[in-house]
A protein has these predicted regions:
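Bacterial N-terminal signal peptides that target proteins for export
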Residues: 1-7
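Bacterial N-terminal signal peptides
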Residues: 9-18
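HKD-type phospholipase D/PLD-like phosphodiesterase module
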Residues: 21-58, 64-206, 216, 220-280, ...
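Hydrophobic alpha-helical segments involved in membrane association or supramolecular assembly
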Residues: 7-8, 292
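Short, low-complexity, Pro/Ser/Thr/Gly-rich segments in the mature regions of secreted, periplasmic
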Residues: 314-328
Length: 328
């Protein structure tokens, strides 16, 4: 896939301004280094950026997906299954409390020969949005495979070819197919076991800057950690979907603490991403809510990767500049 020149331009601008940071300033929860990871920013990257990853599978395509309704995405999975690819898809039975939302995709995938499974009731929701390709590539997304996710919302995608990350993700995906459980991993972080410490570790470990873009933010521990970070001199930016008028009290409280809080009207924010000090980052499916962190199946990547973290920070800064401050 061709590189996105906008990302590299943004990265260059932010990297030039990023302060030096030694290993001692990394988060309290270790964020492991590893193979380079590519960041895709949607909607700018276009829906084909994700669809091409699906269509490129030859031997295997394993997936957890909260909501699968996009015709092109379903067709890509059907096509891979009919071509003999080992397609395994675990779907949430009731996304947005709608028990029929994923039924058409489930039926079509099963008819095409894929191993379609409903997610275990072990979790409140299986909210993950991730897949592996040919046991060699991990794709972690903030988006559901819907029309809005692929072509309308502010979303992020990490494309990761690190073998350890792929293996860890596949252990989780395989467990979700059978209702089992997988062990801990270094960079692949899942709810309900690891998302909370990974995300609070990123926030608590920040030394100079924090940039967050999130659809939902209600968790009291996360809110307290953000306010504490601002109290120790960290510049904190939070972008959420808004609207700015009549903002929830949590965003008014963050703004009162000196945090730069911005409501973005468009593109609609469905992202779940954190950049700390322009050097460490989280991208994944976890919203900053108690349910998402403690009760759902979520999957994300927490990593020490300045290229990803700086590009995230640049995108969030651009969104913040176009956003509005919250008001009661």
């Amino acid at each position: 896939m061709p590189a996105n020149p906008w990302i590299f331009a943004a990265l260059a601008a932010v990297t030039a301004l990023a302060p030096a940071c030694d290993l001692g300033s990394l988060p309290a929860v270790p964020v492991a280094a590893g193979a380079p990871v590519r960041l895709l920013v949607l909607p700018e990257a276009g829906r084909s950026a994700v669809l091409d990853l699906l269509a490129g599978a030859q031997a295997s395509l394993w997936m957890d997906m909260y909501l699968l309704t996009d015709e092109d995405a379903i067709a890509a999975l059907e096509g891979r299954a009919r071509a003999g690819c080992d397609v395994r898809v675990t779907l949430e039975p009731a996304p947005y409390q709608d028990e029929g939302a994923n039924q058409a995709a489930f039926d079509r995938l099963a008819a095409a020969g894929a191993r379609a499974r409903w997610a275990t009731p072990r979790y409140t929701y299986t909210h993950a949005k991730a897949f592996t390709v040919d046991h060699a590539r991990l794709v972690v997304m903030t988006l559901n495979l819907t029309g809005a996710g692929l072509a309308g919302n502010r979303e992020y995608v990490l494309v990761d070819d690190d073998p350890a990350d792929v293996a860890a993700a596949e252990a989780a995906l395989a467990a979700d197919q059978t209702g089992g459980q997988a062990g801990a991993a270094a960079r692949v972080v899942t709810s309900p076991d690891a998302s909370r410490p990974a995300l609070t570790g990123l926030i608590e470990g920040a030394g100079s800057s924090l940039a967050l873009e999130t659809e939902e933010l209600t968790d009291p521990t996360v809110v307290a950690a953000l306010i504490a970070a601002r109290g120790r001199g960290v510049g904190v930016t939070v972008v959420w979907p808004g609207p700015a008028a009549g903002a929830p009290s949590v965003f008014l409280s963050l703004a009162a603490a000196g945090i730069d809080v911005r409501a973005l009207d468009g593109p609609p924010v469905h992202a779940k991403a954190v950049s700390a000090d322009g050097r460490t980052a989280y991208v994944g499916s976890a919203n900053l809510t108690p349910t998402s962190l403690d009760h759902d199946r979520e999957l994300g990547l927490a990593l020490a990767d300045p290229s990803v973290a700086a590009a995230l920070a640049a995108t969030i800064a651009g969104d913040a500049a176009r956003g509005a401050s919250p008001s009661p």
